[in-house]
Amino acid sequence: MAGIGRKIASYVGIVDDRRYDEEDLPDEELTTEVYSDDGYEPSSEVTQLHHHDSNEQHARGHKAVQHRRRSELEEPSIADINRILTVHPRNYNEARTIGEQFREGIPVIMNLTEMDDADAKRLVDFAAGLIFGLRGTIERVTSKVFLLCPRNVNVTPEDKARIASGGFFNQS
């Protein structure tokens, strides 16, 4: 039983466990382990993977697939101002709604004037991560009002001016 008590005391740091202090042992008690040869021999043989170029694939009846970046495939479109979602979150729990709508390609206006500063900062940080991850843009319309645009949507300067001059959003 004393062995268990000593191990616990050593683990907690109450007593020193001198079994592992090499400086306390004489040199003849220090040993080095020698591993036996287990028959392993390094090989210089390289196994080559099958490589097909596009001409070989056509000859075999397979279509050559050209991979394009997603940004090359999606054409930017002008956003309809009626399709912009305006959100007035009162707490951070409403971030999910913002993220889901933005992910669907809908521009989102976040009006954070009704939130306390700590939650507003968290929501702006969330929006910045959302914008970065989905390659969109974020613009500050007024104090505590932000416009989040997906990457395949362009909001015209006229629409931005209308958003900023709308009596509700003009916080300055």
Curated annotation (Swiss-Prot):
Comp. bias regions, Acidic residues: 22-40
Compartments, record wording: Cytoplasm
The organism's place on the tree of life at top rank: Bacteria
Ranges annotated as biased composition (Basic and acidic residues): 48-59
Compositionally biased region (Basic residues): 60-70
GO biological process terms, semicolon-separated: division septum assembly; FtsZ-dependent cytokinesis
Annotated segments matching region Disordered: 18-73
Gene Ontology cellular-component terms listed: cytoplasm
InterPro entries reported in the protein's UniProt record: Cell_div_SepF, Cell_div_SepF/SepF-rel, SepF-like_sf
Keywords from the named record: Cell cycle, Cell division, Cytoplasm, Septation
Biological role: Cell division protein that is part of the divisome complex and is recruited early to the Z-ring. Probably stimulates Z-ring formation, perhaps through the cross-linking of FtsZ protofilaments. Its function overlaps with FtsA.
Family: Belongs to the SepF family.
Subunit composition and interactions: Homodimer. Interacts with FtsZ.
Protein name, entry field: Cell division protein SepF
Taxonomic path: Bacteria, Bacillati, Actinomycetota, Actinomycetes, Propionibacteriales
